[in-house]
Regions:
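Surface-exposed patches in mature extracellular/periplasmic domains of secreted proteins
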Residues: 3, 59-62, 162-166
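Helical hinge/lid and interdomain linker segments adjacent to catalytic or ligand-binding clefts
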Residues: 31, 35-146, 150-152
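Hydrophobic targeting/anchoring helices
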Residues: 1-43, 52-54
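An acidic, glycine-rich "communication" segment
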Residues: 8, 142-175
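Histidine (H) residue identity feature
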Residues: 11, 76-79, 162
Length: 175
């Protein structure tokens, strides 16, 4: 076992490898940003954390908007879509009952939180995450979360959502 650990350390120490050993002085408090309802795909991170018995909390839009992020050291994003376009599953699942139900829930939750569109809600959530990162929080994003987070922030003040998502046209001057 020591031989394996030494090989790993040697590999990480190579200058051409973009890695670093980090000593954790305390166990990080982890939040998983995810809707409360069960989705038809698995999140490998929550599966690994659960299997490893590493504690984490599931938080979502209302908690983020209520400034809960500073309580956590690490935030994990997975299949989330911060653009208001309901993720990458539209083309394959737009007629699936779970997709239709999820879209209705997102729209209901946005209205409940005072937003007329899901894209407006998700932009504010993305801004809160940005503030969290700038304050020293660690973000681990994968899958569609990485792209949609950046797209949402960079498209502030533009309507980039097709009317199938938000019932009005996209801005005509997008380039």
């Amino acid at each position: 076992p020591k031989l394996v650990a030494e090989k790993i350390r040697e590999n990480i120490a190579r200058t051409e490898v973009n890695k670093e050993i980090v000593i954790l002085e305390k166990a990080p408090k982890i939040a998983i940003y995810s809707p409360k309802n069960k989705q038809p795909w698995d999140d490998a991170v929550t599966l690994a954390l659960s299997y490893s018995e590493i504690p984490y909390d599931v938080i979502y839009d209302s908690e983020v908007l209520n400034n809960i992020l500073p309580m956590y050291d690490w935030l994990h994003l997975h299949h989330e879509d911060f653009t208001g376009q309901y993720g990458k599953f539209y083309s394959a699942f737009k007629n699936a009952s779970w997709y239709i139900q999820q879209k209705k829930e997102f729209e209901r939750d946005a209205r409940k939180l005072g937003y007329s569109k899901v894209s407006e809600l998700k932009l504010d959530v993305a801004k809160k995450i940005k503030d969290y990162i700038f304050s020293g929080g660690f973000l681990f994003a994968m899958c569609s979360a990485t792209d949609s987070y950046d797209i949402a922030l960079s498209s502030e003040n533009l309507d980039i959502c097709h009317n199938v998502f938000d019932y009005d046209p996209i801005d005509s001057d997008i380039n």
